[in-house]
Amino acid sequence: MGKILFFGLLLICIFLGFFFYKQKENNIIYNRIVEKFEDNVVIDEIYTHLFKDSNLKELVFIKSQLIIPELEHKKMIKATGYRADAYKALSTVYRFDFKVHDNKILGFKSVIFEGFEDAKVSKHENNLPSEKWQQLKDFNIGDPNINEKFFHLEFPFVVKNTLCVTISKGFFKKIKKLKRLKIMLISNEDREYKIDIENFLPKYNL
């Protein structure tokens, strides 16, 4: 009985050791959220890479799919108009969220993907009508000055800033081919936040 217990505990320890090794090796936290409203479905696949020794705390990649059965119909796929155009533009959206902690509210005036320094950048707000989404270039960083009136303030607590970067389907295909993700964020104060990690995107069915 004692030997059985010993070997059982040994196997558990080996399994846990392997599990935590894989978690550390991949360094990616995966989450899938499915939301239904009426007959429609929104599926978010979320991949989070955590950083330890920096004000830049998280890089989050999100693939969002909007499924509207009525518009999935073959006849509607070829349709035009506000609703059909919006659905075509927003049915699948790719996005990076960069989470930066500071004692100030930050704006980010530039995002640079190494290897694509000449990428075309949009700077409009993210929640927009379909005609603006049709104008999405390689990626969109939003309005860097939207919170400008708060930039001078300093707070006695941690401010969790999130920069949302929506990328086009074409640009996503390009960065998916990279071996490493090398990205630089430049804040309104000209502070640089650099990322250099293994490109985890090709490992998943995205």
From Swiss-Prot:
Q: Which residues form the signal peptide?
A: 1-19
Entry superkingdom = Bacteria
* Protein name per its UniProtKB record: Protein BptA
Q: Which family does it belong to?
A: Belongs to the BptA family.
Keywords annotated in UniProt:
Cell outer membrane, Membrane, Signal, Virulence
Where is it localised? Cell outer membrane
Q: Give the protein's biological function.
A: Virulence-associated protein essential for survival of the bacterium within the tick host and therefore within the natural life cycle of the spirochete.
Q: Which organism is it from?
A: Borreliella japonica (Borrelia japonica)
